[in-house]
């Protein structure tokens, strides 16, 4: 269906000025001013906020403005003039404006349609896809002055469920009062929850069981209908879910490739072995080429003349699959041919990202390439970067990762 947009232009006056400092009290003052100046909306709206280029000053107001606007039921994205481009002066570039507007679309859970991308014949494309994600080192801004380590939550699990055919996006987290929220509702909830005194205690309580309860619930939920779990394998998720490590996988008894009799779920405290073969829930482990030495940076093919040629799509290498996006059609990617950021700080650069997929749990009748192909396709459905075909992570994980923008923290999650 078509998207209808109503635009209203307003001046934010001095709300966009730099704050006196960067303390929690400074943020609270600006949040209160936003609450007093901007009428609360009955429904969730988006606000694209244009700010002055104040990159060399202290007291950046963006985090406070985002929290204040969230309290008025508004999602926010900011536009500032190009920091390093002297030609821009006080005018932001068209690409920056375009990107900010499209990111507001993403914050509402908008994705591109998948049905026009040869997905009809792939049974995986009807499945709900659940991105399993964990934020780490969550220290709320209100704890900035304290030296106590107990005021930092080590991690917080969160889940985003996405169905490409319906376009529906739902978020779940143990911090929410409701079982699930729409994606924009979850962003606003995270903003408010991270400012509460019990935020760290609640994060620690939610994190205690790792992913065990959620995985068992998903196994039962998808007894007859198709579901697909995507989990990005890194140091944090391996600690929470030992069963996704290469060491654990090598010890599984396989009915056939990618169909283990049982898998390990949980961490050292809650680890247990469970069978998922009687469920229609599949699980795929992902590893990013840009973030681990275990995965190559890139893959290419050799043509009949023995020359290297560009590769894109999904390729199988032994028991893993590599997903490679098509070459981005943008100047940033072409800049990377012969230049680097160190020598050209004004220029922007881009690169293709290789993603490794390992089907941790499939059903015996499944074609692994169909399920991996669908997971890789989900990288191409996000709207906020129109100059390239794919983002780094499939849509549910991409959406889950970016929910952290609404936490009001000392430092963003790593």
Question: What is the predicted role of each segment?
Answer:
Residues 1-414:
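Long, contiguous domain-sized segments
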């Amino acid at each position: 269906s078509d998207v209808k947009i109503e635009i209203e232009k307003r001046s934010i006056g001095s709300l966009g000025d730099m704050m006196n400092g960067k303390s929690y009290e400074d943020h609270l003052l600006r949040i209160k001013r936003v609450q007093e100046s901007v009428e609360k909306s009955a429904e969730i709206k988006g606000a694209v906020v244009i700010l002055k280029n104040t990159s060399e000053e202290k007291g950046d107001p963006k985090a406070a403005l985002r929290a204040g606007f969230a309290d008025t039921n508004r999602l926010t994205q900011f536009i500032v003039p190009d920091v390093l481009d002297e030609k821009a002066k006080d005018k932001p570039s068209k690409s920056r404006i375009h990107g900010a507007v499209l990111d507001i679309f993403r914050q509402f859970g908008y994705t591109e349609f998948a049905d026009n991308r040869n997905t009809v014949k792939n049974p995986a494309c009807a499945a709900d896809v659940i991105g399993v994600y964990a934020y780490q080192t969550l220290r709320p801004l209100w704890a900035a002055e304290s030296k106590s380590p107990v005021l930092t939550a080590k991690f917080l699990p969160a889940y985003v469920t996405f169905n490409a055919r319906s376009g529906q996006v739902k978020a779940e987290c143990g911090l929410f009062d409701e079982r699930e929220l729409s994606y924009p509702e979850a962003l606003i909830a995270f903003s408010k929850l991270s400012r509460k005194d019990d935020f760290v205690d609640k994060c620690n309580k939610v994190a205690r069981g790792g992913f065990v309860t959620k995985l068992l619930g998903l196994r039962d939920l998808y007894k007859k209908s198709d579901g697909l779990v995507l989990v990005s394998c890194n140091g944090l998720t391996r600690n929470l879910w030992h069963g996704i490590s290469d060491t654990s996988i090598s010890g599984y008894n396989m009915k056939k490739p990618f169909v283990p009799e049982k898998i390990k779920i949980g961490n050292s405290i809650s680890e247990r072995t469970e069978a998922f073969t009687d469920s229609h829930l599949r699980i795929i482990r992902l590893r990013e080429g840009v973030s681990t030495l275990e995965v190559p940076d890139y893959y290419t093919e050799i043509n009949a003349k023995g020359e290297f040629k560009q590769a894109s799509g999904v390729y199988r290498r032994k028991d893993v699959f590599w997903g490679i996006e098509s070459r981005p059609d943008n100047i940033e990617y072409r800049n990377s041919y012969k230049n680097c950021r160190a020598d050209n700080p004004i220029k922007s650069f881009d690169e293709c990202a290789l993603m490794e997929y390992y089907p941790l749990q499939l059903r015996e009748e499944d074609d692994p390439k169909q399920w991996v192909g669908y997971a890789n396709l989900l990288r191409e459905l996000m709207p906020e970067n129109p100059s390239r075909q794919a983002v780094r992570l499939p849509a549910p994980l991409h959406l889950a990762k970016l929910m952290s923008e609404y936490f009001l923290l000392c430092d963003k999650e790593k």
